[in-house]
Amino acid sequence: MEPCSCDTFVALPPATIDNRIIFGKNSDRPCDEVQEVVYFPAAVHDNLKEHLKCTYIEIDQVPETYAVVLSRPAWLWGAEMGANEHGVCIGNEAVWGREKVCDEEALLGMDLVRLGLERGDTAEKALNVIVDLLEKYGQGGNCSEGRMVFSYHNSFLIADRNEAWILETAGKYWAAEKVEEGVRNISNQLSIMTKIDREHPDMRNYAKQRGWWDGKKEFDFAATYSYLDTAKMMISPGRYCEGYKLLNKHKGNITFETMVEILRDKPSGINMEGEFLTTASMVSILPQDSKLPCIHFFTGTPDPERSVFKPFIFVPNISQLLNTSSPTFELEDSVGKKLQFNSKPDRRHPLYQKHQQALEILDNKTEKAKTMLDNMRKLEKELFKEMESVLQNKHLQVDKIVNLLHQCTEDEIRIYKSNVSS
């Protein structure tokens, strides 16, 4: 399988305005895969003898987990991207290199995204969670629900209100780069070069043993563990380079609307089309002022150019997000659940179903399609304006916010229904 999925971005002051960190990700996955947006509350786990069931394996539970909102392929336990109640955001990428990908079932990179969010209340603590679990349980297993074998190593972009970390892996070996200002992006290639702020203790020795590094020249993680020529990486016409250019084009004035437009960019390939396409997108505003709420926008539908970014804010007593939650199936409580179905179940959630009907109209590019897209943009613009007001006025109406994402999906579905039935 060729590296052909996902782009994750972060922008920090002074590249942004109003002392905000902006996080964004497109999740590029098989075109027939449904991605859901789900919420899990914080929890206390008294019985630590009871193991936690991830996608393929069981691991030790911890005494406490944080509330999380996740955008995830509906068939698995983990997540492609998400955030927790402490303002930590994580997105992961598939990466390939010289180290062989393990076919044995272990933790998926997507499991590690969720585990980092549930167990880390800062970006660096989430990184610690991921690398500790990587050492203990390893990474591996098929990342596709179908018969296609799709396995890879992972890179992660982890951000909070103060900083971001890039974590890139090759099997159990890893390197991490701290990002405290400016812009950074990751795509489907190793990108940490000589600026290595943390690393696996045996990473360099292993590279020497394999003959990938002579131990004399300056150590470059990407050059050592990757197939790619890192000297060409920043000038090649790939998505990593194009994403870097788009971030730098707006450097100094980046807002969450800027990040939305980057995720919608089709000429660069960041908004992907084809057998692999952008199945869901996320943008988060992480104010450095801890008195302000973090705001997370999700599409829950494919193609961000023809989707609505809808806000979510962590407040007490949030109920499950029914319009973006996929159906569950009887056999899905056991580890290795995907192997128990002879064919793929219908995992389309209510928003996804209506959006698919809307796409049929939008594909025709008629006057009706233009009207519907205009209404979608109008709704989104109103939501953006409302969220900006929350940040500027420093006031939250908790009784309204508790059902914010649900109400937004209701409004979006109403647009689709009115145009599909007319």
Curated annotation (Swiss-Prot):
Coiled-coil positions are none
The identity of this protein, by name, is Secernin-3
Carrying Pyruvic acid (Cys), the residues are C6
Concerning InterPro entries, the annotation shows: Peptidase_C69
Q: Which UniProt keywords apply?
A: Pyruvate
Can you tell me which family this protein belongs to?
Answer: Belongs to the peptidase C69 family. Secernin subfamily.
Relate the protein's function as given in its record: Plays a role in thermal nociception.
Respond yes or no to whether keyword Membrane is given for this record.
no
Query: Which residues are responsible for catalysis?
Result: C6
Superkingdom = Eukaryota
Propiece residues: 1-5
Organism, as annotated: Bos taurus
PANTHER family per the record?
A: SECERNIN, SECERNIN-3
| One of the protein's GO biological processes | detection of temperature stimulus involved in sensory perception of pain
| Pfam families (UniProt xref) | Peptidase_C69 (PF03577)
Gene name in the database record: SCRN3
Q: Which residues carry this modification: Glyoxylic acid (Cys)?
A: C6
GO terms, molecular function: cysteine-type exopeptidase activity; dipeptidase activity
